[in-house]
Amino acid sequence: MDAIDIGAPTPTPLPDAPAKDFMTDAQWETLYALLDGVLPSITSTTSSVVTDKNTSILLSDTEFESLIDDSVAALPNGPARSKVKEYLEFRPSQDEKFREDCLRSLAIVPQRGQLIKVLNLLGLLLTWSTQNSGNAGSMLLTGYWTPITQQPTKVREAILKSWATSRLTALRMLSKSLAQMALKANSVYSPYFSEISGYSDVPKDWKPVDGYDYNFIQVPAGNGVHEITTDVVIVGSGCGGGVSAKNLAEAGHKVLVVDKGYYFPPSQLPMTQAAGAHYLYDAGGVYFTDSASIGIVCGGSWGGGGTVNWSVCFRLQDYVREEWAAKGLPLFTSSDFDDSMDRVWDFIGASKDAIRQNPRNQAVLDGIQKLGWKGGVVEQNTGGKEHYCGQCHLGCGSGEKRGPSVAWLPAAGDAGAEFMEGFAVDRVLFAEDGVTAVGVEGKWTSRDENGGVHAHENTRVQRRVVIKAKKVIISGGSMWSPVILAKSGIKNPNVGKHLHLHPVNFVSGVFGNRDMSSWEGGIITSYVDEFENLDGKGHGVKLEPTSNIPYATYSVQSWRNGVDAKLLAMKYRHIGTFISLTRDRDTGRVYPDPRKGTPRIDYNTSDFDREHTIEGLIALAKICYVSGATEIRPHLQHLEPFVPSDGGKRQAEHQPGKDPEFTDPDFAAWLRELRAADNKPPTALWMSAHQMGSCRMSASEDTGVVDMSGRVWGAKNLYVADASVFPSASGVNPMVTAMALADWISRGVASELDG
């Protein structure tokens, strides 16, 4: 593939903003007033820039000048003093782009039939505070008779802080949700964020390559149902679908891969944060569970999760393979599964030979060396190339990441497979016996006349399509595969159950004397597995760096107050963020929304699992400590960051092999607070990027959804090939395991077709 030097990715326009009429103008103004409390304008009492002093947090001239001086002094090579002053005085809630992002966030809340608690409580609060000036409702929820819109910003901030510590779960969640909304909008659209933080949507030395010419099937306009016939229809173009397509096409079978998402070539990647969240992920960037306790990110474009994942290649560990085999699934300790993993490993070019560590990953490696913990460098699916790219979360312009859209699907296409983007499958079709799958049915939506996908669907060609096939493979991932099966009439009560999420909590280290620029370089090229077996049964945590794209990490920082939130943006180039990734023992479920037919998720991290997560946070804090962090910030409410009181003297004197919990009494006292901290959902902040097990493989129909060949129990010619068939959580990033299972399942399907 030849490089194309055009300077920056081709912009991908967003659709028009949705209508805002689900809230009144008065309610929107009250919302903006609350967001003022999250990210306020900060100025001096004598400032001539801010004329309405009620709209800012006011400091004395001395305090304000000192805040600016301290910020500049603490950030070597940071923004100029005049820019810091301008940024502090800026009021984000009045910016139109900031408001638009808040609108988009609220408009795509998944549970629109029963709005999540944020919007419910806002409606309750806003009705009381806007219809009854000086009423009991305002007093009850805010502690003030005067409505929020009439309060100075300092009071708005105080209200949010009181909600964050309220005994009422709903108010604590409201505070958390408002903070996340404001921080996300600020990181995506602030006119100052990039200049203050150093972040750029365009990677250094960006040079895209030519993408594969997919030649997607186009359906003519018409009123009737359009029919297509093939040997195998594969629903989903992600890690499972891509592997399956290659194997079956190379075996000589007619294959059609369909996906509800669209393909974006390297010339459009990485996208901006706003466009990437909208086009490359499901649900506008994040699903929320029914309790809003955990945010779930999963790929939603052509290539699925493989388009946006972070290149990490872990083989499934032996103790997990043995656990799965003990469930009556001997495949997992067989040489056949070894062969499948080896084929995947070789094809994706999993290697660590050319990795160049960025400062954030190096901090992990330095930390485990100083602490004497197990861990190391993790292979990448980059074919032995350096791939110093920290923005694959928003798509990879270099074409070096050998995921489905770059490697597997092109190989399938070269072997004769066909492809169809923009096709949302509603259900599997069955023969008259109700058992034998004979195809799928759904709705196809074209691109617009200019080849874009931002125009309203009603302005594009839409048509019902039936695809008739001898075999149907569902590879929609753990969110969509069970939903498609359920909507197809599969009655097995296990469909959608046994969902594992690898729930994570975060720790950020501020390395004030170092330019981390953590959005540059490999996202996860290091790991710690010292704590992966905390219960003696294979449940624990893996510690890893995480993506430092601002909307993904700045928005999930713990909100303490308005000044701290603004200063965080200035510290961003010095921040490295890490995750405690939990191999969850306990599970949830996925089910179709009764109105929209989209996935709904019922999951709460259990007390058993979250205790392991806390142990991971403690370990991450120790890594940050010994790696020289000047501030350690677990993303937990009510916990103050650790800032060395001695200027880092004890950190500098730390001896390798020593546990700093026993050498620094201040740090030990803070760790006790961390160990006692509340990370209980729904008010604690949890995220998931790995979904597994919702169509799990089992030895009998009573305990799972598919048999050891991937065939759906009680059905014929219907298979599932993706991470949803995992018998439990993998405990490692699941890409390689999902691909290996798809390799096994699709080769079995090919053998059946060959007779």
Model-derived features with residue positions:
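Short FAD-binding loop at a beta-strand-to-alpha-helix junction that anchors the flavin cofactor
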Residues: 709-729
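N-terminal Rossmann-like FAD-binding beta1-loop-alpha1 element of flavoenzymes
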Residues: 223-257
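Rossmann-like flavin
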Residues: 140-144, 148-176, 186, 302, ...
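Glycine-rich loop(s) and the adjacent beta-strand/alpha-helix scaffold that form part
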Residues: 247-274, 295, 301, 414, ...
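Conserved redox-cofactor binding core of oxidoreductases
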Residues: 177-221, 331-432, 437, 441, ...
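N-terminal FAD cofactor-binding segment of flavoenzymes
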Residues: 253, 260-319, 360-369
